[in-house]
């Protein structure tokens, strides 16, 4: 249960478990590790699905989220006051007297979880990466209303992979150009903090998604990114903005290619004597020229393959036309005769219509369900408002140099205010809770002071890679890099943690402070094939020719197997006991599954691939409804 609001507040209050057991059985449960050796708790399983029921708990935590769908027939008591950074899980088993004999079911274990207190310089993507969990899971579990994370928030992390708390030669002008370009967006080896600011460069950077939906190749989104140091760039969303499908290639005088990325950054690929191209150090890309036929002529275009084996196809003008993932699922971009983007078609055939004004700015985005997102610009080409399908509007304000000075959310609340120096760096920032942070820039260092007076110093080299951090409590963290521009080591008071990599940039080994090493291997698609932990135990993975995982084998030899259909959707999963669950689909949406006991579940979806009904094995139907923005309303 989490308290939240549109100003970025997220406060974890408590957690409870619920599940399905035989009607009128007694469910015994306890929290690990706190109650492992103490008296366990009991509750009765109801005849009907009555849980989760947050009514009673909302009296204790009135601002916490509420649950409406009823998916289970028992529920635990509330666990609150949990210790941060401690790994928890809940165990339960049911028993029932049948014909005078007590029958007890198998003990089951919930997902593990930790409670994390957000630090001053965190962002949700960094938190997700550190804990090794999908970002969307964190956002969903905590029902995040604003993607800006606020220091001292407490959040729920499900199934974390850890519960451990968190002088070269002068550069030429061309070197500086390469570095400046790569530092836009989420600059490699840079620190980000506050709302957020690149603490190595002073660039204010943020991204906002106007639409997200489930697709055959995962989550499809249209996401805008803003860079305060990129205001000389004019994109489809105005000055300083970019979006994930606004990508292009252009050629430089020396034959090298400049790749403009969707987050506003750019990379320069050197052209070799044999005509091939080399990516900058630290980036896993393969860029090659290809020939293709357009009407009656052959043309040269380019294909860019990333670390996930997705292929980004550019035409003769260097304009992005297709994105094809490792399984062959293709996202298509169509343009009119004037090369205005007219529509984006997802792998399952969903179409997003695009209208642009005479300046090439996107003014309207039409959605598959008939909804629309509209955009307005000022005379300088700055994006000043975005109105969502619900009719609510975000607003953006800029200074005379088109640097964003503030923006307001859909409720009219000012989320952030920025003040810049003459070099375009953020020197003062006020957040939604009126907390003000300051930034002082020195030679190869930045000193930040938060609203409580805590000072942190960030040091970086001439490539703006973080080399050390001095924290308010006097502790430090030092970082080194190898010749391929990859993080080689991190040294703190606890010791040094070091990393090695394979030829494709994948982490091959991690050696922690006590000298123990974990190792990783990969196949030719950069898919993880084995993990040998610090304790020497190895988990292995195998894949079919399309890159779908077909087995995962634990150290004891127990294997889980998976099968897929011709669209690479998982249609069965068999666990180590031989119990099989089967799945059925309509396009990207799972329409049903049957578990190992023969219990069947069914689902239906709307035009935006959102679940609208769920039918449980007892025939009970739960319905969901959404507003025009896709927010669950009932």
Language model features: what each stretch is:
Residues 56-77:
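Aromatic sugar-binding surface patches on proteins
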Residues 78-87:
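Surface-exposed, short loops/turns at beta-strand junctions within beta-sandwich domains
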Residues 111-134:
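Primarily a LysM-type cell-wall glycan-binding module
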Residues 119, 153-236:
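Intrinsically disordered, low-complexity segments enriched in small residues
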Residues 16-44:
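Solvent-exposed loop/turn segments flanking beta-strands in beta-repeat/beta-sandwich domains
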Residues 222, 228-634:
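Extended charged/polar low-complexity repeat regions
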Residues 1-7:
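Short, compositionally biased P/S/T/A/G/V-rich stretches that sit at domain boundaries
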């Amino acid at each position: 249960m989490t308290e939240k609001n549109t100003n970025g507040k997220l406060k974890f209050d408590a957690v409870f478990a619920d599940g399905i057991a035989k009607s009128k059985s007694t469910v015994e449960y306890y929290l690990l590790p706190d109650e492992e050796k103490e008296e366990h708790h009991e509750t009765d399983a109801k005849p009907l699905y009555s849980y989760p029921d947050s009514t009673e708990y909302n009296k204790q935590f009135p601002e916490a989220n509420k649950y409406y769908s009823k998916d289970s027939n028992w529920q635990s008591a509330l666990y609150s006051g949990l210790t941060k950074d401690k790994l928890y899980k809940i165990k339960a088993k049911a028993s029932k007297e049948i014909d005078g004999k007590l029958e007890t079911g198998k003990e089951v274990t919930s997902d593990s979880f930790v409670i994390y207190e957000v630090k001053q310089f965190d962002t949700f993507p960094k938190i997700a990466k550190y804990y090794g969990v999908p970002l969307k899971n964190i956002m969903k579990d905590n029902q995040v209303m604003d993607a800006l994370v606020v220091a001292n928030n407490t959040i729920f992390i499900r199934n974390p992979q850890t519960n451990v708390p968190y002088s070269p030669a002068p550069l030429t002008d061309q070197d500086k150009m390469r570095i400046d370009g790569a530092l836009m967006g989420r600059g490699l080896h840079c620190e980000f903090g506050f709302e957020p600011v690149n603490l190595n460069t002073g660039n204010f950077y943020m991204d906002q998604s106007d639409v997200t939906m489930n697709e055959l190749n995962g989550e499809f989104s249209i996401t805008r990114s803003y860079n305060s140091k990129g205001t000389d760039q004019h994109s489809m969303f105005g000055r300083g903005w970019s979006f994930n499908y606004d990508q292009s290639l252009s050629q430089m005088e020396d034959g090298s290619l400049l790749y403009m990325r969707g987050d506003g950054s750019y990379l320069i690929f050197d052209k070799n004597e044999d005509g091939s191209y080399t990516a900058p150090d630290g980036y896993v890309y393969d860029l090659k020229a290809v020939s293709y036929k357009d009407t009656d002529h052959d043309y040269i275009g380019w294909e860019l393959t990333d670390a996930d084996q997705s292929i980004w196809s550019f035409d003769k003008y260097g304009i992005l036309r297709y994105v094809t993932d490792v399984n062959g699922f293709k996202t298509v971009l169509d343009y009119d005769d004037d090369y205005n983007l007219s529509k984006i078609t997802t792998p399952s055939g969903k179409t997003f219509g695009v209208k642009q004004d005479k300046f090439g700015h996107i003014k309207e985005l039409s959605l598959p369900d008939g909804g629309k997102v509209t955009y307005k610009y000022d005379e300088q080409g700055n994006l000043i408002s975005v109105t969502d399908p619900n009719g609510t509007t975000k607003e953006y304000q800029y200074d005379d140099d088109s640097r964003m000075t503030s923006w307001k959310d859909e409720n009219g609340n000012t989320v952030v205010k920025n003040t810049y120096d003459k070099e375009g760096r953020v020197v003062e920032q006020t957040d939604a809770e009126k907390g003000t942070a300051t930034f002082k820039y020195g030679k190869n260092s930045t000193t930040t002071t938060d609203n409580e007076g805590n000072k942190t110093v960030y040091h970086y080299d001439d490539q703006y890679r973080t080399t050390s951090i001095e924290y308010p409590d006097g502790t430090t963290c030092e970082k080194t890099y190898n010749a391929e521009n990859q993080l080689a080591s991190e040294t703190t008071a606890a010791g040094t943690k070091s990393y090695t990599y394979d030829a494709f940039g994948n982490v091959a080994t991690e050696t922690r402070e006590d000298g123990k090493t974990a190792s990783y291997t990969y196949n030719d698609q950069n898919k993880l094939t084995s993990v040998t932990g610090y304790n020497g135990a190895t988990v292995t993975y195998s894949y079919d020719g399309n890159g779908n995982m077909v087995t995962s084998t634990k150290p004891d030899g127990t294997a889980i197997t998976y099968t897929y259909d011709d669209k690479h959707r998982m249609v069965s999963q068999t666990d180590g006991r031989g119990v099989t669950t089967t799945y059925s689909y309509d396009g990207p949406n799972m329409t049903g599954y049957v578990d190992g006991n023969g219990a069947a579940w069914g689902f239906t979806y709307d035009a935006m691939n959102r679940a609208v009904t769920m039918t449980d094995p007892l025939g009970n139907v739960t319905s969901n409804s959404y507003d025009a923005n896709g927010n669950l309303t009932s």
